[in-house]
Amino acid sequence: MAWTYFVVGSGSIGRRHSANLQSLGKIVEHLAWREFDAEAFSNSLARCSGQAAVIIATATDVRSELVDICAVHNAPMYIEKPLAFTQKDVAAIYGIEIGLQQRSMVGFMMRYHPLTMFLSKFDSCEFFRLQFEIGHDVRLWRENWSFSESYAARAEGGGVLLDLCHEIDLACMICP
């Protein structure tokens, strides 16, 4: 039986994951969060008999239900960054079976860029001072997108700090 990849979230990132998997010839079920049916999703995972993986590309504050369902079915997850919105959600994720944790990951993909890997090899004790600057214009992040109407603008969405956590992750990698 071939693997089925479930992509949950129909924003720009969810659409990109779905398109990338389809271009690789994978079986993809793309589910919009707004029409999400937890019972139907759980049944679909069960039908895959352990041959399913889930890409979670929803707003941060609605992921815990998805993670719980994936854990019940032992389905590995790729969770778009940031991982969670509350400490309770982080604790729940870290509470899932260790084998499933080891087969899942958070989408901090910039840490695998060759420059990041090169810089992270330096001994941070030798740094006198480092300065990080982020030059994003949030109005230009995504096509046909308005920051004021986005999940990142809502307190429940985590705000810009969580949306720009790639940069915080990079700083922590380069200067542990």
Report residues per predicted region.
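Beta-loop-alpha module in the N-terminal Rossmann-like domain of NAD(P)-dependent dehydrogenases
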Residues: 17, 37-94
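Recognition helices and adjacent regulatory flanks at domain boundaries
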Residues: 31-38, 62-67, 110-112, 116
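Predominantly a Rossmann-like dinucleotide-binding segment in NAD(P)-dependent oxidoreductases
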Residues: 110-176
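Histidine-centered beta-alpha loop that forms part of the nucleotide-sugar donor binding/catalytic region
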Residues: 59, 82, 107-109, 133-135
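Rossmann-fold dehydrogenase core element
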Residues: 92-109, 125-132
